[in-house]
């Protein structure tokens, strides 16, 4: 499917969604990732009118047709990358600030081509992690590695995680000898990472990957981290 077709499909949502039925959160459009059949997500913000992906607002709502409803918008809604979706959702403003401040040009990396899974801490998670400190107090190289500890190098959906049940995967964070640090996941009670952070909103699909919103920053792990998180080490 060509880009123009995908952009048009990115303006179509299944079902009749009157403006009064829309609420802040994510919906799926008919556009898909180029390398999968996953439907792209759209962030709807109803805090001040109806704003879509942070770039377009509903100008004329609720034009009824025989097979659906049309909402006239004031800007074309482009195909969103991971960074686009982070920018669209005010709950991720601290994450965007951290990505911008860290070494490694992470905003560019996560805006570019690739297939990533980002575990995205919300603003409350960053506030708890910083514990009164400023983002600028964290060395930029350390901040980059902490952020990369939330990035996987492939698309992993919540269905994939639940299907696996529990186990280890690799993040893009650097460990000893430049090896990639591991991440432990367990789906016994929701989806939990390294025993410290849980998925609050799953499967925000973008052109270059997927986002899972999480409720806590995942620190760089030690041996004790995995011993405490993995029930196989409980005895």
What are these regions (language model features)?
Residues 1-235:
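Mature, structured domains of secreted/extracytosolic soluble proteins
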């Amino acid at each position: 499917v060509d880009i123009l077709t995908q952009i048009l499909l990115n303006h179509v949502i299944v079902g009749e969604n009157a403006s009064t039925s829309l609420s802040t959160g994510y919906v799926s459009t008919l556009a898909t990732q180029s390398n999968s059949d996953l439907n792209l997500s759209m962030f709807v913000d109803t805090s001040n009118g109806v704003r879509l992906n942070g770039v377009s607002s509903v100008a004329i709502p609720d034009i009824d047709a025989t097979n659906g409803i049309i909402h006239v918008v004031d800007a074309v809604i482009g195909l969103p990358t991971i960074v686009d979706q982070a920018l669209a959702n005010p709950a991720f403003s601290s994450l965007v600030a951290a990505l911008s401040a860290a070494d490694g040009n992470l905003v560019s990396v996560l805006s570019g081509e690739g297939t990533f899974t980002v575990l995205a801490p919300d603003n409350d998670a960053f506030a708890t992690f910083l514990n009164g400190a400023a983002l600028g107090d964290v060395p930029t190289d350390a901040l980059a590695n902490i952020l990369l500890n939330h990035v996987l190098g492939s698309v992993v959906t919540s269905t994939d995680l639940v299907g696996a049940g529990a186990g280890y995967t690799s993040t893009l964070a650097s460990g000893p000898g430049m090896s990639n640090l591991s991440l432990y996941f367990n789906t016994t009670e929701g989806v939990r990472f390294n025993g410290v952070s849980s998925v609050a909103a799953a499967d925000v699909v973008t052109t270059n990957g997927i986002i899972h919103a999480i409720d806590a920053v995942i620190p760089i792990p030690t041996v004790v981290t995995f011993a405490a998180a993995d029930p196989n080490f409980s005895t």
